[in-house]
UniProtKB/Swiss-Prot annotation:
Belongs to the PPP phosphatase family. PP-2B subfamily. Its cofactor is Fe(3+); Zn(2+). Present with 7040 molecules/cell in log phase SD medium. Fe cation binds at D119, H121, D147. This is Serine/threonine-protein phosphatase 2B catalytic subunit A1. GO terms for biological process: calcineurin-mediated signaling; cellular response to pheromone; conjugation with cellular fusion; fungal-type cell wall organization; intracellular monoatomic ion homeostasis; positive regulation of DNA-templated transcription; regulation of cell morphogenesis. It comes from Saccharomyces cerevisiae (strain ATCC 204508 / S288c) (Baker's yeast). Composed of two components (A and B), the A component is the catalytic subunit and the B component confers calcium sensitivity. Calcium-dependent, calmodulin-stimulated protein phosphatase. This subunit may have a role in the calmodulin activation of calcineurin.
Amino acid sequence: MSKDLNSSRIKIIKPNDSYIKVDRKKDLTKYELENGKVISTKDRPIASVPAITGKIPSDEEVFDSKTGLPNHSFLREHFFHEGRLSKEQAIKILNMSTVALSKEPNLLKLKAPITICGDIHGQYYDLLKLFEVGGDPAEIDYLFLGDYVDRGAFSFECLIYLYSLKLNNLGRFWMLRGNHECKHLTSYFTFKNEMLHKYDMEVYDACCRSFNVLPLAALMNGQYFCVHGGISPELKSVEDVNKINRFREIPSRGLMCDLLWADPVENYDDARDGSEFDQSEDEFVPNSLRGCSFAFTFKASCKFLKANGLLSIIRAHEAQDAGYRMYKNNKVTGFPSLITMFSAPNYLDTYHNKAAVLKYEENVMNIRQFHMSPHPYWLPDFMDVFTWSLPFVGEKVTSMLVSILNICSEQELDPESEPKAAEETVKARANATKETGTPSDEKASSAILEDETRRKALRNKILAIAKVSRMFSVLREESEKVEYLKTMNAGVLPRGALARGTEGLNETLSTFEKARKEDLINEKLPPSLSEVEQEKIKYYEKILKGAEKKPQL
């Protein structure tokens, strides 16, 4: 065996070989880059990037010892360094916020001066910039119009920091509900995934409970109707808002849905003015863009403002290139009938838009714009670098191994041709041996069979590695489906799901979905013991009644 190894092309590297000895004098604390710059291996290569906080803070740090309220100053810095809270601390802040918010009416009535902000969407580092531009919340009143979570990677940090400011500034800091503050949308977009990555389902449920108690609208200075989405055909008076049962999930239709989902029509500014309104013109049309609620017209806005003695509607809900948009002026008041605010700069890291806040003070309205702030990068779906890169690396490594091992021709690797060719060759050698009786011919025949066996083993290895390569490729390209299958199958990928590539994965997913739907009845909450007893009583009563109705023999 050793002789075969030495005669092969494989070089056995021994530990005492001179060319693999480590230079003991080399300073391993220093590393020279390609450009000649020497850096320390003990320090962070890019010192300008803040280090991540890995420590879970104590309760004394998170909560004020005197008031018991969240320490928003500490949380601000802790979240800035990507720190996390314990599960108990997070739930405590969420429960405190739920209690405080539930005591507020559906329609808030606020006074100026106040700063009004639009969508935040999980952009925590831009939220900190917002407070730099808008002013210290301890000194200035704030009204947020909703959509604190989803899309951005720091939704939880935004929510908890805003809640901590709310709890410390009751009567001065106000938060409305947006259409993303619900289980339906947060499950579809990113917030639920973020919560399961950073915490767990219990913390996510606590967040959703807090969403259900957020107020729906605000009347600012008795002149401005502030809401996340817009107005509704069911909204005749601002007081109609107080008639809504808001302590629930957002419905798919009705006044509550419209307040959070409605948009102005695309040609809002092209409408006629005042008495020139076209009587046949619709005030509300189906909102095809959103798939629910309505799109309201300039005519609808003017009618609502006139009926309630208001100047303007201030809302959020739509990204704006400048961070805000002033719509067509109301001819009666000479003031914009509608204002849209958006406070998430460079939305989704792709829009390149500015953000803005509206500062209203002494009957003067100022709009302050700001640009995005640098923020830590997260991979899609909160993947870690190993989960993200391993399938790619594995695919390339196996591809390289296939290339190295693929030293046989296609004919040699053909499973049908190999045994036949080997058999024919051996038979020919055997016949020749019988005729000549030469021992060397017998050895040659044995060598041919051995070569064919090796070739077959090599072919099987190549096919096995190619199969692994294919599985890595599927893992990389279909990572979302793979993760979903694992989630729905107790964290384990069903056997054979990757073997047949993307097609097989899709079939597995389809089959699994069908089975899951059929089994949904078992996902319901089981009946209580009292309910079981009631069902038994009803069953026995039904049997007795049936027995009484039978004729006596």
